């Protein structure tokens, strides 16, 4: 069995190139296909190619980096075993690599980790320890155990050999198509982007390498703006595979030097990209797996790119099946094919008919209403559009010219997650209430902790929860606080769940507030 050679602390590009060429990743990983997306290529007037890392034995690229590092361990290190912390694809990569190398592995995963992920790691032969409420607590425990018991820590991204292992993907890309114009790569901790960029710039520097981040987890963008890695105050939950608060030090150094550009996208755009992948190549990508395609589509539109050969990395397909319901609901918005509007119309006979006639025959995709006032009615309406933002603006102008008050909710996350399912729940009298959105761990006892901390001191006047198949759920709750708001803030801090005050959200005022 080949052994990779150790790299220096901050290797230069040529040293990374040699490490990529020597990385013995194919003892565990596979060369994955580069496949043309015929339908999308025709639609976007470019040749769109997808690198199918979902075809790896662990259904993600993470196997490359994990094996590259672990294959280079000394016999003494292998005898002591390895440890890592992960709730996702890195855990499976380490477990699979350990089985191939005959090395004991311990994977520390947060207690809220979905059973499907825990079972997958165990299925590859890894020992699992469930510890902590989140990744940071799991990581702290893993590092503690590494120091106490002599395990070797296998980082998910910020290590030269992990980066070199991910760089083998770029070498395959160039061998499969040497005429690429641009390559789009997803970014979480930066290992894949760093490995791809440094390899391509050593061999074919004319190819542009563009990083893609989720808007709510853009740690690389924040680091580039600051000039050094920084901690994000919070990260999004939807594209959990790239939900990293801080870019790695070495990955940042390489990304800063070798990347050509960076772009961010929202969750709706990711959902639309997931649909594109399914319709074109029948791949069911996880959200972070479709991130690069979402960024590519946005980049093409922003820069009016035509006639180029563009590749993107489908980085993983470890999707929770129940999360696909959420994707299906949101992809129309991501494709700019649906407008969500709050419209005030007269509470009188014939007003619905007049409103629909003013839409000019456009298809209504959603219509939510409940009587609440004798004078005016507030309706939540979805309208199918075919020309994106321009048509949405045209509809709003038509409605305003027709005498209606209109608020565009198409980009309002709270409206899309919660309010659309709650229209008609306005209280009969004004309430002194504050509205908050929460992120709950999907684990036994989470709701009980919430109620023990907050529900016994203040009346809960509104509550909405819907599972989206991720490790965390989204909850919308309102409380009658009266004169006890300072005490409530203290209790929120004790609760420890991520939360945001939504009391001034227009969707709340239109449809739910007393």
Curated annotation (Swiss-Prot):
Cofactors required: pyridoxal 5'-phosphate
PROSITE patterns hit by this protein: ACT_LIKE, DEHYDRATASE_SER_THR
Keywords assigned: Allosteric enzyme, Amino-acid biosynthesis, Branched-chain amino acid biosynthesis, Isoleucine biosynthesis, Lyase, Pyridoxal phosphate, Repeat
Reactions that this protein is recorded to catalyse: L-threonine = 2-oxobutanoate + NH4(+)
Enzyme Commission no: 4.3.1.19
UniProt: pyridoxal 5'-phosphate binding residues: 89, 188-192, 315
Domain ACT-like: start-end pairs: 339-411, 434-504
InterPro entries in alphabetical order: ACT-like_dom_sf, Ser/Thr_Dehydratase, Ser/Thr_deHydtase_PyrdxlP-BS, TD_ACT-like, TD_ACT-like_sf, Thr_deHydtase_biosynth, TrpB-like_PALP, TrpB-like_PALP_sf
Residue positions, PTM N6-(pyridoxal phosphate)lysine: 62
GO molecular function, one term: pyridoxal phosphate binding
Involved pathway(s): Amino-acid biosynthesis; L-isoleucine biosynthesis; 2-oxobutanoate from L-threonine: step 1/1
Activity regulation remarks: Isoleucine allosterically inhibits whereas valine allosterically activates this enzyme.
EC class: lyase
One annotated GO biological process: threonine metabolic process
Alphabetical list of CDD domains matching this protein: ACT_ThrD-I_1 (cd04906), ACT_ThrD-I_2 (cd04907), Thr-dehyd (cd01562)
Highest taxon listed in the record's lineage: Bacteria
Family statement drawn from the similarity comment of this UniProt entry: Belongs to the serine/threonine dehydratase family.
Function: Catalyzes the anaerobic formation of alpha-ketobutyrate and ammonia from threonine in a two-step reaction. The first step involved a dehydration of threonine and a production of enamine intermediates (aminocrotonate), which tautomerizes to its imine form (iminobutyrate). Both intermediates are unstable and short-lived. The second step is the nonenzymatic hydrolysis of the enamine/imine intermediates to form 2-ketobutyrate and free ammonia. In the low water environment of the cell, the second step is accelerated by RidA.
Subunit structure: Homotetramer.
Descriptive protein name: L-Threonine dehydratase biosynthetic IlvA
Gene expressing this chain: ilvA
């Amino acid at each position: 069995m080949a052994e990779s050679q150790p790299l220096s602390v901050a290797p230069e590009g040529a040293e990374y190139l040699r490490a990529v060429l020597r990385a013995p990743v194919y003892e565990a990983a596979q060369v994955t296909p580069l496949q043309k997306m015929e339908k999308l290529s025709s639609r976007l007037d470019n040749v769109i190619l997808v690198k199918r890392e979902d075809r790896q034995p662990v259904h993600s690229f993470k196997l490359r980096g994990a094996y590259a590092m672990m294959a280079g361990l000394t016999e003494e290190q292998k005898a002591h075993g390895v440890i890592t912390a992960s709730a996702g694809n890195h855990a499976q990569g380490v477990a699979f690599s350990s089985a191939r190398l005959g090395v004991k592995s311990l994977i520390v995963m947060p207690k809220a980790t979905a059973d499907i992920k825990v079972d997958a790691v165990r299925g590859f032969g890894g020992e699992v320890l469930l510890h902590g409420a989140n990744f940071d607590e799991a990581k702290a425990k893993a590092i503690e155990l590494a120091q106490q018991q002599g395990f070797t820590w296998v980082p998910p991204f910020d290590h030269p050999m992990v980066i070199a292992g991910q760089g083998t993907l770029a070498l395959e890309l160039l061998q499969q198509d040497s005429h690429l114009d641009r390559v789009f790569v997803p970014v979480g901790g930066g290992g894949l982007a760093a490995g791809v960029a440094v390899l391509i710039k050593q061999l074919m520097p004319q190819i542009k390498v563009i990083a893609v981040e989720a808007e709510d987890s853009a740690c690389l963008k924040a680091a580039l703006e600051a000039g050094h890695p920084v901690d994000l105050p919070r990260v999004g939950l939807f594209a959990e595979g790239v939900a990293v608060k801080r870019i790695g030090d070495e990955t940042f150094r390489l990304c800063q030097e070798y990347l050509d550009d960076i772009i961010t996208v929202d969750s709706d755009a990711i959902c639309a990209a997931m649909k594109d992948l399914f319709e074109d190549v029948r791949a069911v990508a996880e959200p972070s797996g479709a991130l690069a395609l979402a960024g590519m589509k946005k980049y093409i539109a922003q820069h009016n790119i035509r006639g180029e050969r563009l590749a993107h990395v489908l980085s993983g397909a470890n999707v929770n099946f129940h999360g696909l319901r959420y994707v299906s609901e949101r992809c129309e918005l991501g494709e700019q094919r649906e407008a969500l509007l709050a419209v005030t119309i007269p509470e009188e006979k014939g007003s619905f008919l007049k409103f629909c006639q003013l839409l000019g025959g456009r298809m209504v995709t959603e219509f939510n209403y409940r009587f609440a006032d004798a004078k005016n009615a507030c309706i939540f309406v979805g309208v199918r559009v075919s020309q994106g933002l321009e048509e949405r603006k045209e509809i709003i102008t038509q409605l305003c010219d027709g005498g209606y008050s209109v608020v565009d909710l198409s980009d309002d996350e709270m409206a899309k997650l919660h309010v659309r399912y709650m229209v008609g729940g306005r209280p009969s009298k004004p309430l002194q209430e504050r509205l908050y959105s929460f992120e709950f761990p999907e684990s036994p006892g989470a709701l009980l902790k919430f109620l023990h901390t907050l529900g016994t001191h203040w009346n809960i006047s509104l509550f909405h929860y819907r599972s989206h198949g991720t490790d965390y759920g989204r909850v919308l709750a309102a409380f009658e606080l009266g004169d006890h708001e300072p005490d409530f803030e203290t209790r929120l801090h004790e609760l420890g769940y991520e939360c945001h005050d939504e009391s001034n959200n227009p969707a709340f005022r239109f449809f739910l507030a007393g």
